[in-house]
Structure formats: structure tokens, C-alpha cells
Amino acid sequence: MFAVIETGGKQYLVKEGSIIKVEKLEAEEKKEVEINKVICISNNGLSYSSNATVKAEVLEQCRGEKIIIFKKKRRKNYRRKTGHRQYITVLRINEISLQK
């Protein structure tokens, strides 16, 4: 069974037991979160679209890899280099359930 969930403006394909990195969620480590924005859920070829929830455990709150932003104007000696690290949450999918 797998599901497509939406969180942080992005969509993720998840299965039970899978580990994903999502945009920062306001939850403590080792706590369980419930994601209600399930776009579709599929079980052995049968697909459903609503009344589903995904329960996940927060494994870690951390920061992602550094993104380098480099700006330059040729022949003008103009160079700017900055970096950015986004806050992310690491989740383990525990349960995909379909409510009836």
C-alpha cells in the first residue's frame, strides 16, 4: 500500500516504514504527527482519493544541505556569494489508514 501526501507545498510518495525529509513541521522529536492532506492512496491496484490519514513519527529536526547563491556581473568586479540551509524534518511513516 502506498499514498501520495502533500506537506510544505510538495508531494511525496510514501509507503509504510519509509523515511522521508519534509519541510519543517512544528513537532518535537519522537512524537507522532498525523498528515490529513492525502492526495491518493492505492492498495493492490485499487485507488482511493479521500478520507485517508497518514501517521508518522518525527525522527529528527535538522537542517538540510547548504545551497550556494552566487551573483556576478561581468567586467564590473561585482560578485556576491551567500549560502542558505533550510530547516527540515525527518519522518518515518508508521501507518496509512483509510477511514470509512
UniProtKB/Swiss-Prot annotation:
Transmembrane segments: none annotated. PROSITE patterns: RIBOSOMAL_L21 (PS01169). GO terms for molecular function: rRNA binding; structural constituent of ribosome. InterPro entries: bL21-like (IPR028909), bL21-like_sf (IPR036164), Ribosomal_bL21 (IPR001787), Ribosomal_bL21_CS (IPR018258). The keyword Heme does not apply. One of its GO terms (cellular component) is cytoplasm. SUPFAM superfamilies: L21p-like. It comes from the Bacteria. Keywords: Ribonucleoprotein, Ribosomal protein, RNA-binding, rRNA-binding. GO terms for biological process: translation. This protein binds to 23S rRNA in the presence of protein L20. Part of the 50S ribosomal subunit. Contacts protein L20. Belongs to the bacterial ribosomal protein bL21 family. HAMAP family: Ribosomal_bL21 (MF_01363). This is Large ribosomal subunit protein bL21. The gene is rplU.
